Regions:
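Ligand-binding clefts of soluble mixed alpha/beta catalytic domains
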Residues: 1-146
Length: 146
């Protein structure tokens, strides 16, 4: 039923407000109105983690690919080198999944104190309502270029 959830999230016509409160990786991130679904607002709690995949998953995948490649070539994989590579990959991914790292790269609208979540939710709903009900007056004069 994952495809139904993704279709619903993509086509929904109500405000999309996302709060990363724990770990959010890969397809699950999309399915729960992550950045790819252009939510109206997206915030993170300080302990939240987000990314394409976790460091552990990424390093495990790379290790499996390297072992399979070595076996295809008829070579014994260098497990010591793979362990070092695994640690390096985990370190890089882990440093980039932190809420402050991702927020600093504008992948959300800010890191919020969990105690303020209800207040922020109310403010964002008011903002969305105002956007929907605001009338804009067209520009009635030309724009001079200098």
């Amino acid at each position: 039923h994952g495809s139904k959830m993704i279709q619903a999230a993509a086509n929904i016509r109500v405000p999309k407000l996302t709060f990363y409160v724990g770990a959010s990786y890969g397809a699950g991130n999309y399915g729960m109105a992550g950045l790819g679904y252009e939510p109206d607002f997206l915030f993170s709690w300080p302990g939240a983690k987000t990314g394409v995949m976790s460091g552990e998953s990424a390093s495990g995948t790379m290790e499996a690919v390297a072992i399979a490649g070595a076996k295809r070539r008829g070579v014994e994989p260098d497990m010591e080198a793979l362990a070092k590579q695994r640690a390096a990959i985990e370190k890089v991914f882990s440093s980039q999944e932190d809420a402050f790292f991702t927020s600093g790269r504008l992948l959300d609208h800010g890191v919020v104190d969990p105690r303020d979540t209800r207040k922020i939710l109310g403010f964002t709903l008011e903002t969305i309502w105002e956007r929907k009900h605001r009338t804009l007056n067209p520009n009635a004069f030309g724009i001079g270029r200098m």
